[in-house]
Amino acid sequence: MKQESAAQSTPPPSLSPAPSAQPSWEDGDPQALWIFGYGSLVWKPDFAYSDSRVGFVRGYSRRFWQGDTFHRGSDKMPGRVVTLLEDHEGCTWGVAYQVRGEQVSEALKYLNVREAVLGGYDTKEVTFYPQDTPDQPLTALAYVATPQNPGYLGPAPEEVIATQILACRGFSGHNLEYLLRLADFMQLCGPQAQDEHLEAIVDAVGSLLPCSYLSEQPLALI
């Protein structure tokens, strides 16, 4: 059985010192805002945006530690979705979306329901490094589930998490689709993007599932 490790995502090679990230919004009335997605937002943002960039945040590791009773599970059988765990050696890949003008309030209103009300996530500022220009970091808003929210499930062996994922379905689809689409995204990012926790759960699912699972729609890198 694979043991949980605090740092399981491999960051890219060290970069030369980068300038401080510049905030993308001011005084609660932003004209432009970057939103960092590291779970279902990487393939299904469902809000209008002006730009998007693949990249990573440092100091966090992605974990399937948040319970989901709506999108990928139910009250009786909560699914498992990802959150960010503070980890000074961690690196989490995802997509940052830029919203501007009227898109800002529309996106935040939508995400408040999707991520906060239905998902149990809080907001947090993170420093995002675009894959193509890592020396030009951006300040972004991320949705993070903490142990204080009632849906938080916390750590479990990868085999247990895989069993839960295989058994759960919610209004947005099967929990397995969520896992495999996230794994597809990581493969498209290239060999420098690694997430051992995610890979271990995919492997555990493969050992439990006798047949292959195909996503309904192919995933294209944004």
Curated annotation (Swiss-Prot):
The active site is at E115 (proton acceptor). It is found in: Cytoplasm, Cytosol; Golgi apparatus, trans-Golgi network. It holds the Pfam family ChaC. The keyword Lyase applies. One of its GO terms (biological process) is Notch signaling pathway. Substrate binds at I35, F36, G37, Y38, G39, S40. Keywords: Apoptosis, Cytoplasm, Golgi apparatus, Lyase, Neurogenesis, Notch signaling pathway, Unfolded protein response. It catalyses: glutathione = L-cysteinylglycine + 5-oxo-L-proline. InterPro entries: ChaC, GGCT-like, GGCT-like_sf. Its EC number is 4.3.2.7. GO terms for molecular function: glutathione specific gamma-glutamylcyclotransferase activity; Notch binding. CDD domains: GGCT_like (cd06661). Residues 1-25 are annotated as: Disordered. GO terms for cellular component: cytoplasm; cytosol; trans-Golgi network. It comes from the Eukaryota. Interacts with NOTCH1 (via extracellular region). Belongs to the gamma-glutamylcyclotransferase family. ChaC subfamily. Catalyzes the cleavage of glutathione into 5-oxo-L-proline and a Cys-Gly dipeptide. Acts specifically on glutathione, but not on other gamma-glutamyl peptides. Glutathione depletion is an important factor for apoptosis initiation and execution. Acts as a pro-apoptotic component of the unfolded protein response pathway by mediating the pro-apoptotic effects of the ATF4-ATF3-DDIT3/CHOP cascade. This is Glutathione-specific gamma-glutamylcyclotransferase 1. It comes from Rattus norvegicus. The gene is Chac1.
